[in-house]
């Protein structure tokens, strides 16, 4: 088997395609959560906290020097980190709720009583009796 045919078989498996779809949806979900945090969640939090915009929070280690415009300020931007942590918590909560929903659905499926087999028809009953008689004669 050539390497190309092995690769084609590997790609054609459902797991690889499912993983690719999951990564693409995850990337799109990341953009949605970023927009949600930056544009909807953080403005009210900043308003409650006296108009603080977390994305602008930083510890400036070395300020801009107007004499050397090529050098930017050096700062630890902990506000961006706070936004990222909030974004992570929202994603983690969404994934938790999704897993919880899937577990509830699986539990409901497991709790359903198994479907009972229908009673044998008279013809099947007769055939089983004949089978049993033949077994007894053989013994």
UniProtKB/Swiss-Prot annotation:
Q: Where in the cell is it found?
A: Cell inner membrane
Question: What is the superkingdom listed in this entry's lineage?
Answer: Bacteria
What topology does the record note for this protein and the membrane? Multi-pass membrane protein
Where do transmembrane segments lie in this chain? 16-36, 40-60, 79-99
By its UniProt entry, which Gene3D superfamilies does this protein fall under? Large-conductance mechanosensitive channel, MscL, domain 1
Q: Cellular component per GO? A: plasma membrane
Has keyword Protease?
no
Q: Does the keyword field hold Ion transport?
A: yes
InterPro entries for this protein: Mechanosensitive_channel_CS (IPR019823), MS_channel (IPR001185), MSC/AndL (IPR037673), MscL_channel (IPR036019)
Keywords (alphabetical) are: Cell inner membrane, Cell membrane, Ion channel, Ion transport, Membrane, Transmembrane, Transmembrane helix, Transport
Which GO terms of the molecular function aspect are on file?
A: mechanosensitive monoatomic ion channel activity
SUBUNIT field: Homopentamer.
Family as reported in the entry's similarity comment: Belongs to the MscL family.
Role description: Channel that opens in response to stretch forces in the membrane lipid bilayer. May participate in the regulation of osmotic pressure changes within the cell.
NCBIfam families (UniProt xref): mscL (TIGR00220), PRK00567.1-4 (NF001843)
Q: How is this protein named in the record?
A: Large-conductance mechanosensitive channel
């Amino acid at each position: 088997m050539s390497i190309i045919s092995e690769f084609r078989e590997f790609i054609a498996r459902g797991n690889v395609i499912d993983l690719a779809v999951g990564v693409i949806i995850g990337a799109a979900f990341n953009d949605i959560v970023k927009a949600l945090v930056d544009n909807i969640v953080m403005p009210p939090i900043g308003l409650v906290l006296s108009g603080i915009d977390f994305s602008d929070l930083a510890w400036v280690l070395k300020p801009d020097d107007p004499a050397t415009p090529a050098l930017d300020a050096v700062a630890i931007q902990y506000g961006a980190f706070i936004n990222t942590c909030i974004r992570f918590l929202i994603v983690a909560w969404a994934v938790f709720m999704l897993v919880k929903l899937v577990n509830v659905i699986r539990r409901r499926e497991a709790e359903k009583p198994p479907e009972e087999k229908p009673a044998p028809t008279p013809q099947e009953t007769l055939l089983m009796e004949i089978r049993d008689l033949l077994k007894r004669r053989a013994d």
